[in-house]
């Protein structure tokens, strides 16, 4: 009986000790559980794969200066090639001798001529304009206008006046009177329209060859044609890149 009492007391003491230890660890486990719960909530608000995007910085843009001279040279080359194809494919080469892109002296400077045809029927001096849109102008007007829309209007020098200077330069170079020259202005862009009444020597590409072929009376002798072609064939008039650069520079320096 006494042994049973000791055993009972021992069990009670052991139970008390275990309870005391559990009560000490409880706050620690509670704190840990609270922290784990807070971490789970935080993870729900901010997923692990969330990427914070930075606001992109604007790129620096370098604007190139507008070079209208360069653009005009390129357009002139296109128009010149269109005229070249028309002449070489539709005119008799034994009668019509074609020269293109010459830079010749004029009044102490130089002038560039797009296209020249030497024939028994005269010397045709052709100014090609590769312009898109509607063309407005008059024979005596100093400035013509090219219009692409209500808000796009571009003035340009009367090409008849421009080509007159070419004719005068050729007169001096090949020593021929003015009445042996035919000045022609051809607008070569397929989307170009002449919107005002202009003389017949201002035309579109499709009208160019018929205009040339209407001149059928010989006015230049064969020996003179040979002499003129020899002069125009000289390498010194060829528009090489170096001579073209010098010509453009002289144009920019003129008042």
Predicted regions and their residues:
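Active-site beta-strand-loop-beta-strand hairpin of nuclease catalytic cores
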Residues: 118-140
């Amino acid at each position: 009986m006494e042994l049973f009492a000791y055993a009972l007391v021992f069990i009670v003491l052991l139970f008390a000790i275990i309870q005391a230890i559990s009560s000490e660890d409880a706050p620690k486990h509670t704190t840990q559980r609270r922290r784990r719960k807070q971490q789970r909530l935080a993870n729900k608000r901010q997923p692990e794969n969330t990427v914070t995007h930075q606001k992109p910085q604007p790129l620096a843009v370098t604007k190139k200066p507008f070079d209208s001279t360069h653009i005009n040279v390129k357009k002139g080359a296109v128009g010149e090639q269109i005229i070249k194809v028309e002449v070489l494919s539709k005119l008799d080469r034994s009668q019509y001798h074609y020269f293109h892109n010459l830079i010749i002296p004029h009044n102490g400077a130089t002038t560039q001529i797009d296209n020249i045809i030497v024939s028994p029927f005269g010397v045709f001096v052709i100014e090609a304009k590769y312009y898109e849109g509607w063309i407005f102008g008059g024979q005596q007007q100093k400035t013509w206008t090219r219009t692409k829309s209500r808000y796009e209007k571009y003035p340009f020098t009367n090409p008849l006046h421009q080509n007159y200077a070419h004719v005068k330069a050729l007169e001096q170079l090949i020593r021929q009177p003015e009445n042996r020259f035919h000045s022609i202005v051809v607008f070569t862009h397929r989307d170009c329209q002449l919107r005002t009444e202009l003389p017949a020597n201002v035309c579109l590409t499709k009208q160019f060859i018929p205009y040339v072929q209407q001149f059928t009376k010989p006015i230049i002798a064969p020996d003179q044609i040979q002499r003129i072609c020899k002069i125009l064939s000289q390498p010194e008039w060829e528009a090489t890149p170096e001579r073209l650069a010098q010509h453009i520079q002289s144009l920019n320096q003129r008042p």
